[in-house]
Amino acid sequence: MYAILAEKPSAAKAYAQALNGKRQGRIYVAPPSSLLPEGALICAAVGHILEFLEPGELNEKYKSYSLDSLPIIIDLFQYKVVSDKKEVLQRIKDTIFDKRVKTIILATDAAAEGEYIGRNILYRLQCKKTIKRLWTSSMTATSIQKAFSQLKADAETLPLYYQAKARAESDYMIGLTLSRAYGILLKEQGIVPHNTTISLGRVQTPLLAEIVKRERLIEQFTAENFWTVKATFNNQGNVYEGEWFHEKENRIFKEEQAEQLCELVRNQSSTIMEMKEEMRTYQPPLLYXLSTLQMDAGNAFGFKPAETLKYAQSLYDKGYLSYPRTQDERITESDARELENNIQFLSGHDTFGALFPLPVSTLMNNKRYIGEVTDHHALLITDKIPKDKDLSEDEKSIYHLVVKRILAAHYPDVAMSHKEIITKVMDRFTFRSKGKELLSKGWHHIIPPTNENDIMLPTLLKGSEGVVTDTLTTKSKTKPPNRYTSSSLIGFMKNAAQAIEDEDRKSISNLPLGTEATRAGLITLLESRKYIEWKKNKVYPTLLGITVVDSIKRGSVIKSPILTAKWDVKLNEIGASLYNHKDFIAHSKKLSSVLFEEVKTYSSTWNQNGVERIKSESIGACLLCGSNVVLRKGKHGEFYGCSNYKDSGCTFNLPFKVLNKKLSKKQLMELLKNEKTDIIKGFKWKDKTFNAPLVWNREDQKVQFGK
């Protein structure tokens, strides 16, 4: 008999359905079949159910939050069960050690991280049974059954475990060492408040540095006025417009010069110097990888990357989409054959049925879409087609994007005619006219462009003459670089080569920051650390984010994507059995020590380099000692307390919640100012709900309910 270990309950359910299994208690039982002749027990983790032991649990010296305990170097990582996941691990243990089970099928996600999650559990339980690996990018019954018929040998995917292990352990040591070091030093020098959480990391810090760099460019930008000049021409009855240009410049930075140009050319004769006309074709876009889906969803719906991943993951869990955390935009011939079958199920769909029959019936033999893929092919629909009413609005938005992308690939190229006329006036001044005309709509039937209006130009003879009948100047301003949006931030992370110095950029043309699976989480992490904030889908660094970046030495590898580039090369080599994971971890330990020494030395220059100090925002005066009441951090989370607690031992604090009622900042400020609040609605005690003000009892020195 087999025991199947899934990464999450939804996957276990999908496996059970594909194998005609039934639920028995907290697991599924699949009957004997041609795929699994002895049947199977199916259990599930819930993602990561194990976590590293804290450094202080491994070594007493690391319990001390001091520079003397750094860097954190761990020779043998050990794991503990996540506090609320003990029951899950016990259920897995009971399943795989069932006396009937002879072979374990590791069926976690088909990627390095899935390998890491699954094998950590098996190693923790000291499982010595035979292991087989299930590898599938789709959760449809057909794909699952096919994967069970082609189980991989244990050794075939083991290198992916070492790849993920090397990354996790190295990131942990470097991240924790630097987070502690910078946190201690920034707080010691009074640059950040003592309740501030400071974190640095190989990927999060270069991303934050880029956001801060863009903000600085915007702040330092000085807008300039400029003018453009347009002329209207009449060439033997053919009227058209052109814009002045000289070499590559079409802007004039002095108004009087623009006006003079208008006066000079008005009513003057003109000559056609060049007349170009060509037909261009535009291929349909490639299929979606996660990043390109996140970019389009951000532009179309304002979704943050984490939201797009959430909805795509939900569609995958329900069996409507293939595995979403993919970096590939192509598919294999086998995938194309399956897609050819699945796409026909859309012909009866309320939204997409009218688009059938498709002009191109198959993607087979189309090298633009068909080729080798890495772990997972591009995002595809499955043979399970949902009705719009079965999806939430957000899920529907994502599903429709993916479907349209696939359908567009089954339409011909867009064909457009482009014209360009270069007109010369007074044998001195040149004007450019550009026109376009849609000849064949092609895949724009499926994905219309934002602006498809034709700009018609006449066909004129080179050397033919006309006259300038009118001129117009238009005033504009130079614009700073755009702030990053959720979409453009993902675009930057797909290739961060632009962020590195010119001499290094020559050798690195493609530099991804993070992976398809981690990018959304990295952006969310910066937000949770209060390093960035969002305003109308644009990202801004906070003062804390700027301070952290400024505290890092210029040129430090922790602030540059170069480190990630080098790591990715080696990590991929580990996954391909071309490099030893132990050598990688040894190098990471040395780097952790180097970066720790770097911050110790550089921190002495923070004052002279103008690293900005951040003061805690006060919400009022302490009712015991009169000092500021600020947001602080304790063992059980954040709370408002006296800022003078270290010097005077003042213990004053205010609760965030009273009887399950969350108090607003405004209510807490009112309490500090007036020693009472207005009536607050919604307190709950046992089965009753009541309304009451909060008051400060001076005698007992505590907050209580008033009348």
Curated annotation (Swiss-Prot):
Native organism: Alkalihalophilus pseudofirmus (strain ATCC BAA-2126 / JCM 17055 / OF4) (Bacillus pseudofirmus)
User: According to UniProt, where does the site described as Interaction with DNA lie?
Assistant: H48, R167, D171, R325, R529
Give the stretches traversing the membrane: none
Family indicated by similarity: Belongs to the type IA topoisomerase family.
UniProt key word Isomerase: yes
E.C. no: 5.6.2.1
Please provide the record's keywords in A-Z order.
DNA-binding, Isomerase, Plasmid, RNA suppression of termination, Topoisomerase
The entry's function note states: Releases the supercoiling and torsional tension of DNA, which is introduced during the DNA replication and transcription, by transiently cleaving and rejoining one strand of the DNA duplex. Introduces a single-strand break via transesterification at a target site in duplex DNA. The scissile phosphodiester is attacked by the catalytic tyrosine of the enzyme, resulting in the formation of a DNA-(5'-phosphotyrosyl)-enzyme intermediate and the expulsion of a 3'-OH DNA strand. The free DNA strand then undergoes passage around the unbroken strand, thus removing DNA supercoils.
InterPro entries found in the cross-reference section: Topo_IA, Topo_IA_2, Topo_IA_AS, Topo_IA_cen, Topo_IA_cen_sub1, Topo_IA_cen_sub2, Topo_IA_cen_sub3, Topo_IA_core_domain
Its protein name is DNA topoisomerase 1
Keyword Isomerase recorded: yes
Q: What biological process terms from GO does the record include? A: DNA recombination; DNA repair; DNA topological change
Start and end residues of each Topo IA-type catalytic domain = 157-596
The kind of enzyme this is, by top-level EC class, is isomerase
Q: Tell me, what is one Gene Ontology molecular-function annotation carried by this entry?
A: DNA topoisomerase type I (single strand cut, ATP-independent) activity
Describe the protein's quaternary organization and the partners it interacts with. Monomer.
